[in-house]
Amino acid sequence: MFDTYLRRWDLVPDGGPILSASGGVLPVTRHAQPAMLKVATCDEERRGNALMTWWNGNGAARVWLHDRDAVLLERACATPTLGELSAAGHDDDAIRIACDAVARLHAHRAPQPPATVPLRDWFHALLAHARDDGHDEVLRVSAATAQRLLAAPVDEAVLHGDIHHGNVLNFGDRGWLAIDPKGLHGERTFDYANLFCNPAHDLAVDRARFERRVALVADAAQIDRQRLLQWIVAWAGLSAVWSIDDGRTADTPLQVAMLAARSLGLK
């Protein structure tokens, strides 16, 4: 997977690989400069690589070299992470940092953005589950909310699609930047919703912390509180369906969806 690019781009391995079903990442150096080589083996990851290249370092890690299947990225600092900030009692700061990175991504207006997936397609699994009467009421509420949002989007943008505490990293003098996008297109508020399911269950489902986060994100992103809550309901439902389909627990997204629904008076 990596050997072709090690030769082509004159790279030296600088750590062990991280492999997945969708590709792999390898720490490397190039001319003594730390970097990360990311190789995609599926279209979703290729789409993300193309979007990273299009952002050109604006709110995202800088891409130094690229082709259809691979990108060579600047390497982040190991610490601190946003998850560590939240765990240390600085969750407000972590949320504001993530919101700033998202705003920079959405502000990018270079010509010819790469191919992206519409949000309606992204929500297919949730909308399909909603037709099954055997599923939990919260999923039906999530699906109905998603239907309304997707039918009348506002303030659309090219979206990262997977903003959470592990996908906004510290790049030292360059600040906090995003990695690993999905490459979507739709209402910009969507990109903030996944923050509410992260970085840990106990924090995500704490009602007081949830309400505090809603206020922080609405203010930092300059978005309507009610609209944000609706997108949280929709996103958390989709996340829960994915977890259920994969045989994993969906406790966190289901509880987050219920918190948002109750704040909206839907449950």
Region roles according to the model:
Residues M1-A60, H66, F171-D173, A260-K267:
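Conserved NTP-binding catalytic cores of kinases and kinase-like/nucleotidyltransferase enzymes
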Residues A21, W231-G237:
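Small/polar glycine-rich anion-binding or flexible loop at a beta-alpha turn
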Residues F2-T4, A107-G161, F171, D219:
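An alpha-helical support segment within catalytic cores of ATP-dependent transferases
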Residues A32-L72, A76, P80-L105:
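A conserved alpha-helical element in kinase catalytic cores
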